Amino acid sequence: MALRLVIAEKPSVAQTIAAALGVKGKQDGYIEGGGYLISWCVGHLVQLAEAAAYGEQYRKWQLDSLPILPEEWQYAVDPDKGKQFATLKELMHRADVSEVVNACDAGREGELIFRFVYEAAGCKKPMRRLWISSMEDGAIKAGFASLKDGRDYDALFASALCRAKADWLIGINATRLFSCLYGKTLNVGRVQTPTLKMLTDRDAAISHFQKEKYYHVRLDLSGAEAASERISDKAEAAALKGACETETAVCVSLTREKKTAAPPKLFDLTSLQREANRIFGYTAKQTLDLAQALYEKRLLTYPRTDSSFLTDLSLIHI
């Protein structure tokens, strides 16, 4: 009997998928039954190898060894997760497994996590893609009823791989360069360094801020209000106020319009993080971790997204 190997991003997600599909046979590192083998990645099982993997000359941080530009990129299995990788590799190469389903999170990072394992394991079997944004049983079953060809997501993987390689090239080379020049470890990153620059600029602006007094002239027109723009000169503001007090306001035009205010859109990850920080003081990572945990408990739709819309299927369940 041909089996379908399903690989989720985390054990908890694998267990949820197994429950939805009625798969109950727990094994060491996977769940088996009903024509399925369901296993998991435990996050980033495989990553791009460190610089030393490309030659002993890169083991020490030296200026004359820079830049480090791999011609053929290598993968490295997280040493703390080697057992689970070995399990996945063995499952992928089982003779009775006919295809492998990528059930990692429906996003760029989920695609990368699966593909790195798939490629590092040397798997050549057909790939299918489970693309769902809800962990409800109905959404899972519907997703398996309409699995996509894994190669349809090659562009998404290319995007994730490009990001990973850019992080590696900038992080490895720039960190070594500036650390050697500075004499101490000075971490440089594609995202963290520009972000640090923004924080530095903001801190400098606050430090050099000069208080400036300004004035507004406000009119109360029996139900309607009007205000001038900022006026820095007190005498000018007083003159405008005096001129208004000696004249009669006349309404020369009145337009009435009916407007419909649309309800606010649902949260995407960025707006959720911003609001959680404003109300609760949570960091971006705290919000993401909490949202991910709620998603895995089927209380939120998939949080790692920049979309503020629901699928028709998600709407039904919500």
Predicted regions: what they are:
Residues 304-308:
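Short, Lys/Arg-rich nucleic-acid/phosphate-binding segment
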Residues 1-164, 168:
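Intrinsically disordered, low-complexity regulatory segments
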Residues 126, 196, 300:
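Conserved ATP-binding/catalytic motifs of P-loop helicase motor domains
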Residues 316-318:
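Conserved small/polar residues in nucleotide/adenosyl-binding loops
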Residues 159-189:
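Amphipathic alpha-helical segments of the small helical/lid subdomains adjacent to P-loop NTPase cores
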Residues 311-314:
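Short, basic-rich loop-to-helix N-cap that marks the start of a DNA-contacting helix
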Residues 37, 45-78, 90, 183-292, ...:
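Long, highly charged, low-complexity internal segments
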